[in-house]
A protein has these predicted regions:
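FNR-like FAD-binding dehydrogenase module
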Residues: 1-399
Length: 399
């Protein structure tokens, strides 16, 4: 674990060690029978959120109302308000352009863990909201009949038939279950583009069904939904402004070139500047105008010109990458494209004395520009780095 030398000179020894400990704690990941959990620090934060919400919902009595017919059970009320409060955070942590990244500098892909696990916490809290809504009429019917279970079941069936919130709630639970299942790594890898398409559709349907399910006059529940919609619009507008700036109200023109082993090199000139290791989203209007695909930039920006050349290496697997490869194979080497980004990127490495860059296969596309940037800075005396170990593991040597 390395701390930049320039920071080490400024920090006391104890603070330096504490900083190194925090970094080591963050990078560590627990594995349970092949299931990789989030990094330790996000895991602690998510566990704290889960425990706090669970204790707040389940730790207060009573769970059900007594003596007041058709009154909502307190357990369901607490769980419902908690679930609504989670929704704006879940949506904003899953957006590329979000206020959390702007305020903290944390790139949006590092917030995805809160987006994914926040949805799982939401599902758990939503189940705690739904179950008492069914149990309450059962208890009311049983109590009013002197303890007859059949009367309780009848009252529960009547509540289900006469209350439209049960139907909308069931739809919401089904949608939320599918959102969580389809977001698992296995399903994402099957067909990423289809995953993105259906994820957007199902999420919009989920948010739209929340409005009729929530009572607009009860505990200001719609305020959370309005906040969520506002954050979504703000994210879209931010990306639109960024896209207009990157593309100058026109499309860039990418050049395609086939390489060995199903690889395609995408090259395009642009005026935007980026940091080594960052990535961009490319939208090809003549292929799939409604979809954009992330690609890591393998080059570094020019320091002596207003324009730079972005080069991308894409392996043809399926979807857009296969279409690009086939297009280049047919001799169609030029294609218009919209640029969205750049996003992400590692921390500044110029303060480290010894740097180890590890890559596997096409993962080298992230580390190669870091290597180029460090070498250039070493030549210009702009870095503390004295030694770079570059390790690239591949299945076979290219012909």
């Amino acid at each position: 674990m390395f701390i930049p030398r320039e920071k080490k000179r400024q920090l006391p020894s104890s603070l330096f060690k504490f900083s190194a400990f925090c970094r080591g704690l963050h990078y560590h990941c627990f594995r349970i029978k092949g299931w990789q959990l989030p990094h330790t620090v996000p895991l602690i934060m998510l566990a704290t959120l889960f425990v706090w919400m669970t204790v707040w919902v389940l730790g207060t009595l009573p769970y059900y109302s007594h003596g007041f017919k058709n009154e909502k059970p307190p357990l369901a009320t607490r769980a419902g308000s908690s679930a609504l409060a989670l929704i704006p955070f879940i949506f904003t942590s899953g957006s590329r352009f979000n206020p959390i990244s702007l305020a903290t500098g944390i790139s949006h892909e590092k917030l995805q863990v809160f987006h994914q696990y926040g949805a799982r916490i939401l599902l758990f809290i939503s189940v705690l909201h739904g179950i008492p809504m069914l149990v309450q009429p059962y208890l009311d019917g049983k109590r009013s009949s002197g303890g007859d279970p059949a009367a309780g079941r009848t009252a529960m069936q009547e509540a289900w038939d006469n209350n439209p919130h049960f139907e909308s709630g069931t739809v919401l639970i089904v949608l939320l279950v599918w959102i969580n299942i389809s977001s698992m790594r296995f399903f994402r890898r099957l067909h990423y583009e289809f995953f993105v398409f259906q994820h957007v559709i199902i999420t919009v349907a989920f948010l739209a069904n929340l409005f009729p399910h929530s009572n607009v006059t009860y505990m200001d529940s719609w305020n959370y939904l309005f906040a969520t919609v506002a954050l979504i619009i703000w994210s879209w507008l931010g990306r639109l402004v960024l896209s207009i700036y990157c593309n100058k109200l026109s499309t860039a023109h990418a050049q395609l070139e086939n390489l060995n082993e199903g690889m395609t090199r995408i090259s395009l000139k642009t005026h935007i500047k980026w940091k080594p290791g960052q990535y961009i989203y490319l939208r090809f209007p003549f292929l799939k105008v409604l979809q954009s695909h992330p690609f890591t930039i393998t080059t570094i920006p020019s320091t002596d010109s207003d324009t730079s050349v972005i080069q991308i290496l894409a392996r043809a697997k399926g979807g857009i990458t296969r279409k690009l490869y086939d297009r280049a194979k047919q001799g169609k080497t030029h294609i218009p494209v919209f640029i969205d980004g750049p996003y992400g990127g590692p921390n500044n490495l110029k303060g480290y004395k010894h740097i180890l860059l590890l890559s596997g296969g096409t993962g080298v596309t992230c580390n190669f520009p870091l290597l180029l940037d460090l070498v250039r800075k070493m030549e210009n005396g702009e870095t503390e780095c004295e030694l770079i170990d570059f390790v690239w593991s591949v299945r076979s040597r290219s012909k």
